[in-house]
Amino acid sequence: MEPLQITEEIQNWMHKAFQMAQDALNNGEVPVGCLMVYGNQVVGKGRNEVNETKNATQHAEMVAIDQVLDWCEMNSKKSTDVFENIVLYVTVEPCIMCAGALRLLKIPLVVYGCRNERFGGCGSVLNVSGDDIPDTGTKFKCIGGYQAEKAIELLKTFYKQENPNAPKSKVRKKE
């Protein structure tokens, strides 16, 4: 991970990603939000939708990828060309699954807020973004640390509350 040089552009896009994360929190989701920017235009945005959809793969990045594919179709753009020129702005380091998808799509740059110490795919757990992994797409650059404290506070807020979508405990009490 490279150190972050904060620019007005990064501040603008990350502010919008944090709005998506707040929306996720307001809707009972893990507060992660992201934007996929192509040619200074948002072509995909997402927030976690795992609980809403009952689909564990509906992370913010996956939702945004689907939107980019739709945008490409509506604008007669070749998705491979678009993905190769996208910058992803996301509030939390992409998980291993999402980092794998980003690598396969050849997204060149990811800017993120806080590290994902449990599932991070940009170096916190595995370095999917930068390791030599045969036949798995292209390495991509990760720049982290933008308002990491803010991202962590959003996550703490989520994990302090009751999750009505969590499965019931199957632990039996001894009698």
From Swiss-Prot:
Residues where Zn(2+) binds: H59, C95, C98
GO biological process: tRNA wobble adenosine to inosine editing
Gene Ontology MF terms in the entry: tRNA-specific adenosine-34 deaminase activity; zinc ion binding
Sorted UniProt keywords: Hydrolase, Metal-binding, tRNA processing, Zinc
Keyword Disulfide bond: no
The organism's place on the tree of life at top rank: Eukaryota
GO CC annotation terms, alphabetical: cytoplasm; nucleus
Catalytic reaction(s) noted: adenosine(34) in tRNA + H2O + H(+) = inosine(34) in tRNA + NH4(+)
Domain CMP/dCMP-type deaminase: 8-133
Alphabetized PROSITE patterns for the sequence: CYT_DCMP_DEAMINASES_1, CYT_DCMP_DEAMINASES_2
EC number: 3.5.4.33
Cofactor(s) listed: Zn(2+)
Active site: E61
Enzyme class, UniProt record, top EC level: hydrolase
Entry's family note: Belongs to the cytidine and deoxycytidylate deaminase family. ADAT2 subfamily.
Protein's job: Probably participates in deamination of adenosine-34 to inosine in many tRNAs.
HAMAP family: tRNA_aden_deaminase
Record's protein name: tRNA-specific adenosine deaminase 2
Organism, as annotated: Xenopus laevis (African clawed frog)
